């Protein structure tokens, strides 16, 4: 699904940023609460938005990753006609969708992607926005997400490949990431492991860790809240902070 802004004769061409949104759902389904409402909010801020309905259960790694790589390359290939800055194409993921977005961030330069898709670097995201992401297949893993992406009896290689903190490199794009301390679904240690790896590799990042909020709170307001616990005014600041960060010069 795409939520692109029309080129206006009054405004003129703007060469706007774009985000490709990967909703969460534990690699079992694609969350509606982290799809269209988020895309519309980005569009309201002058950012083109796309939602990727990626393959989930019974479609093991790297199926969804290859789909995101193709989507990123497709958006970049159409950047001129859609009034998109080809150097400002970001991936934005929530929970398991955060794992998918971060997977492209750390694996975009790997041989298995380039050889399969015959890409050079047109699929590289320029930055990542990660919301309460699944990151590790180790001690702090989200069991359901990892099982759905690699199976119940995974081979060592794919199990290592989906533990993303081990694959951050100097080629990983800059990152905005946030999480809640009291997340009892995807432990906050997932984010901590990732920012430690980013710091070790000298990758620019901005991180917010909120004391309360739990998991799966999306925009944290009436737009996406299905129950009172998903409304959190303090955590809702993540979005405006992410937009400011996204529009700031790369560092």
Predicted regions and their residues:
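Short beta-strand element of the alpha/beta-hydrolase
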Residues: 15-24
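Catalytic nucleophile-loop/oxyanion-hole region of alpha/beta-hydrolase
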Residues: 30-32, 52-86, 232-234
């Amino acid at each position: 699904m795409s939520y692109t802004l029309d080129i206006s004769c009054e405004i003129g061409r703007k060469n706007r940023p774009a985000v490709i949104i990967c909703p969460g759902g534990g690699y079992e389904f694609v969350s509606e609460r982290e799809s269209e409402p988020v895309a519309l909010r980005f569009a309201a801020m002058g950012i083109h938005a796309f939602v990727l309905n990626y393959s989930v259960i019974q479609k093991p790694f790297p199926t969804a990753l290859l789909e995101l790589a193709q989507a990123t390359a497709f958006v970049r290939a159409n950047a001129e006609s859609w009034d998109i800055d080809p150097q400002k194409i970001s991936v934005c993921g929530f929970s398991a969708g955060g794992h998918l977005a971060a997977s492209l961030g750390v694996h975009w330069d790997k041989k298995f992607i380039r050889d399969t898709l015959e890409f050079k670097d047109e699929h590289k995201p320029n930055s990542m926005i990660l919301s309460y992401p699944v990151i590790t297949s180790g001690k702090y893993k989200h069991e359901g997400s990892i099982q759905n992406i690699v199976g119940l009896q995974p081979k060592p290689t794919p199990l290592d490949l989906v533990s993303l903190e081990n694959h951050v490199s100097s080629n990983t794009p800059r990152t905005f990431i946030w999480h809640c301390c009291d997340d009892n679904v995807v432990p906050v240690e997932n984010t901590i492991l990732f920012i430690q790896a980013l710091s070790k590799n000298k990758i620019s990042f901005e991180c917010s860790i909120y004391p309360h909020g739990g998991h799966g709170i999306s925009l944290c307001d009436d737009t996406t809240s299905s129950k009172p616990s998903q409304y959190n005014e303090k955590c809702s600041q993540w979005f405006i902070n992410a937009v400011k960060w996204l529009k700031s010069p790369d560092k």
